[in-house]
């Protein structure tokens, strides 16, 4: 499973990502931001107390972040079909809390990544630091045209701080009659023959082609 360090480094490669919060009125807000540090407790971000972003995190206590990294943008052919270059998407969702001044001082003394937060607080006194301390997420590595491998995706889910996750991918039940229809229908090469047939969750895009093709609904 990916460590918090691994997750941070993937997001850091992306740079700025979409940070979504509950707006307090039944809706969702999002904005572009980034994580600036990590440790064993979680991922760290900073904002200012006058911003809706701050209020929404304090009142709602939840945060969801996603971003994508690819070497080239999607291109469209003459039939308006998209062609994606290999890349990956990262997402993480969980709880977020405000660090006290004492906590921040201790972390800044031990971890040089917090220097930017100290600098910002000195320059903009309303700057605060929050930590995503309990969360789950997924690395979705894609190569839809199979440029570098013989299957389209690799998914890896992770969690920390007591959060849990549902493993990626569908499953095949014992009702399977081993006819192979699901394997023929799967364009992601996620199905392995056996008794019963088995779906590799890390390759499964949950498109539903296998269920659609199965004559017994297994």
Per-range role (PLM):
Residues 50-114, 124-127, 136:
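Short, structured beta-strand-loop surface elements
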Residues 33-37:
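A short, well-structured catalytic beta-strand-centered motif of the EAL phosphodiesterase domain
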Residues 118-156:
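Short, active-site-adjacent segments that bind or coordinate small-molecule cofactors and metal centers
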Residues 181-198, 209-218:
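Iron-sulfur cluster-binding cysteine motifs and their immediate structural context
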Residues 157-175:
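A mid-sequence, solvent-exposed acidic-amphipathic segment
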Residues 9-26, 63-67:
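A short, Trp-centered hydrophobic/proline-enriched beta-strand micro-motif
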Residues 40-44:
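Short active-site oxyanion
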């Amino acid at each position: 499973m990916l460590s918090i360090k691994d997750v941070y480094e993937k997001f850091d490669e992306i740079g700025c990502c979409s940070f979504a919060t509950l707006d307090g009125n039944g809706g969702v807000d999002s904005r572009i931001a980034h994580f600036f540090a990590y440790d064993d407790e979680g991922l760290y971000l900073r904002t200012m107390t006058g911003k809706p972003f701050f209020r929404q995190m304090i009142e709602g206590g939840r945060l969801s972040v996603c971003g994508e990294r690819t070497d080239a943008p999607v291109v469209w052919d003459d039939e308006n079909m998209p062609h994606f270059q290999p890349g990956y998407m990262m997402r993480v969702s969980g709880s977020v809390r405000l660090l006290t001044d004492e906590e921040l001082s201790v972390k800044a003394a031990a971890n040089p990544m917090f220097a930017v937060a100290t600098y910002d607080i000195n320059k903009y006194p309303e700057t605060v630091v929050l930590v995503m301390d309990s969360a789950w997420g997924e690395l979705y590595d894609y190569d839809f045209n199979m440029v570098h491998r013989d299957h389209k995706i690799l998914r890896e889910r992770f969690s920390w701080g007591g959060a849990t996750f549902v493993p990626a991918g569908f499953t095949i039940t014992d009702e399977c009659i081993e006819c192979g229809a699901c394997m023929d229908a799967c364009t992601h090469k996620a199905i392995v023959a056996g008794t019963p047939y088995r779906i590799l969750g890390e390759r499964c895009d949950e498109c539903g082609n296998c269920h659609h093709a199965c004559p017994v609904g297994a």
